[in-house]
UniProtKB/Swiss-Prot annotation:
This is Cytochrome P450 monooxygenase CPUR_05419. Belongs to the cytochrome P450 family. One of its GO terms (cellular component) is membrane. Keywords: Glycoprotein, Heme, Iron, Membrane, Metal-binding, Monooxygenase, Oxidoreductase, Transmembrane, Transmembrane helix. Disulfide bonds: none annotated. It comes from Claviceps purpurea (strain 20.1) (Ergot fungus). The keyword Transmembrane helix applies. Its EC number is 1.14.13.-. Pathway: Secondary metabolite biosynthesis. Heme binds at C473. Gene3D superfamilies: Cytochrome P450. It is a single-pass membrane protein.
Length: 534
């Protein structure tokens, strides 16, 4: 047995008595001490600034103490433009909380940004703070677990872009367009004496894009069940207008937008799950029963329930994020130019003889209903230019990457770097509003692509509408087809003119928008007057 000597026994008298020791302190004193300690730790955290590679670009002066460059979220384009203008090299650094970000600009930096293998797009997602997926953590469907570095998400989108699937669902998409546009004369206030009316393209075209995308990328049941579709429209609309990226800058500050993103993502999950479960259960032991839709492709691949639902939530959000707005943009702008409408109509009339017998009578719209996929994709070059110009002018956003390597990445021609562990960001307006590539860049002119400037022909990645470099839009085939279908049906069925809410003709409207805000919108007070062609 150990023999403890008196001088080795610690004095424990501090634990007893009423006048000394921590245990004798009042609860209030303990609470204040804890609060003071926590506050001190928090202030140290706020004051701490991580070290940055000395070769990183200089920091922009457009910053707020402790938070960083809030303008990245609140003034998306003007913050970027002004920071580039103040930089000697066109590159600049800024903080978002404790996250170091390098803003890059110019052709060489853009190519580096889009091509470098160590700049990861998915791991940079937290900087955006938009959409239904809250990251981190990154869900399995978005991780590069497939061949060639593809994710489950990319692999399944590519499956849905195959000709067999698009052709099999084409009629569902064209039928939806015809139904929506045909409903205009009866659903809208008609003008006396003519088969015409007035419509705001925003809501009608937005809902059309949503219903088409669900039929192409999910299943018919969601659209055909009115109550379910209305819920889907409402939840998606909320998510489209929520931005909680500032949680990167102020993670210690509660965020209502962040909470709402989680909530509406949960509501979509609850909406989609029963439909997927029903399909999975219906396939058990029934080899002969197979639906003809995207959900069936996922089920036939043996995909798990959670992966299917997560994929569907993400793919539908992405597929309508730009198309939902662009459909209204295209119609709104086309109203102001009858010459462009005539060019589209000429392409329609030139396309129908390719597949429709000359001796078989039919209206132009009936012929469109029977147009095969290969004709849709090859017969409308001017329509494609209109779409391209609409994307150039109306799809503006900051792209982000994370340097996941252990080495700094040189920014060509600057002597500066994107440090290891730092984010890189690029604003698409840097290319799309470049006067050297696009003269008078704020003027909508699809014909500029017919005779592009030499710089626009040769500059690498001068157009970013469908992504570029290592991250091209894997769903662009459907996106182009969908926008083409809607524009072609609109022109085939009606003549269009721009007007106010009372049907009075409007002079040309400036369709520029506030590029600083998230979720930009169409010009307000602009309506479309339509007159039936047939």
């Amino acid at each position: 047995m150990t023999d403890f000597k008196n001088d080795t026994i610690p004095d424990m008298s501090w634990t007893t008595g009423s006048n000394s020791g921590l245990l004798s302190s009042s609860p209030t004193t303990l609470a204040l001490a804890t609060l003071a300690t926590g506050l001190a730790v928090f202030l140290v955290y706020l004051a701490y600034t991580p070290s940055v590679d000395a070769l990183a670009p200089e920091f922009t002066s457009d910053t707020t103490p402790l938070i960083g460059s809030w303008g990245f979220y609140s003034r998306r384009w003007s913050f970027w433009r002004d920071s580039v203008a103040r930089s000697k090299t066109g590159q600049f650094s800024f903080w978002l909380g404790k996250n170091h970000v390098v803003g890059v600009s110019g052709a060489a930096a853009r190519k580096m940004f889009l091509d470098h293998q160590s700049l990861d797009r998915i791991k940079a997602a937290p900087l955006h703070g938009i959409g239904p997926e809250i990251v981190p953590p990154i869900h399995f469907v978005h991780q590069p677990n497939f061949s060639k570095g593809h994710s489950y998400f990319q692999r399944r989108v590519l499956d849905l872009m195959k000709t067999e699937h698009l052709a099999s669902r084409l009629h569902a998409a064209t039928r939806e367009a015809r139904t929506v546009f045909r409903g205009f004369p009866t659903k809208q206030t008609t003008l006396k004496g003519t088969r015409s009316g007035i419509v705001s393209p925003v809501d009608s075209c937005y809902r059309l894009v949503l219903s088409q995308s669900v039929r192409m990328m999910f299943c018919d049941e969601l659209v055909d069940t009115h109550e379910l579709f209305e819920k889907y429209v409402a939840f998606t609309h909320e998510l489209q207008h929520l931005n909680s990226g500032h949680t990167c800058a102020v993670p210690w500050l509660p965020s209502l937008a962040h909470t709402k993103r989680r909530y509406y993502r949960h509501r979509l999950h609850c909406l989609f799950t029963p439909l997927v479960e029903k399909r999975l259960q219906s396939q058990q032991g029934r080899a002969g029963s197979r639906a003809n839709d995207a959900l069936q492709i996922l089920v036939d691949n043996g995909d798990e329930l959670d992966n299917i639902v997560t994929f569907l939530i993400s793919v539908l959000f992405i597929s309508i994020a730009n198309a939902g707005k662009l459909a209204g943009v295209l119609l709104n702008i086309l109203c102001q130019n009858p010459i462009w409408q005539d060019r589209v109509l000429s392409e329609i009339n030139a396309a129908t003889p390719k597949f429709w017998p000359a001796d078989k009578p039919a209206t132009l719209v009936e012929k469109l209903d029977g147009m095969p996929l290969e004709v849709w994709e090859a017969s409308f070059p001017f329509v494609e230019l209109i779409i391209r110009e609409a994307i150039r002018m109306h799809v503006a956003f900051p792209m982000t990457r994370l340097n996941v390597s252990s080495r700094a990445i040189p920014i060509p021609g600057t002597g500066q770097v994107v440090p290891s562990g730092s984010f890189a960001a690029y604003n698409t307006n840097d290319a799309h509003l470049n006067e050297a590539l696009y003269p008078d860049p704020l003027r909508f002119d699809p014909e500029r692509f017919e005779t592009p400037r030499e710089g626009a022909k040769t500059e690498t990645y001068g157009f970013l509408g469908w992504g570029n470099g290592r991250h091209r839009c894997v769903g662009q085939r459907w996106a182009k087809l969908q926008l083409s279908i809607n524009l072609v049906y609109a022109v085939a069925m009606y003549k269009w003119n721009s007007c106010d809410a009372d049907g009075n003709a409007l002079p040309p409207v400036d369709h520029s928008f506030d590029r600083d805000r998230h979720g930009n919108q169409l010009a307000q007070g602009v309506f479309c007057k339509y007159e039936c062609r047939e």
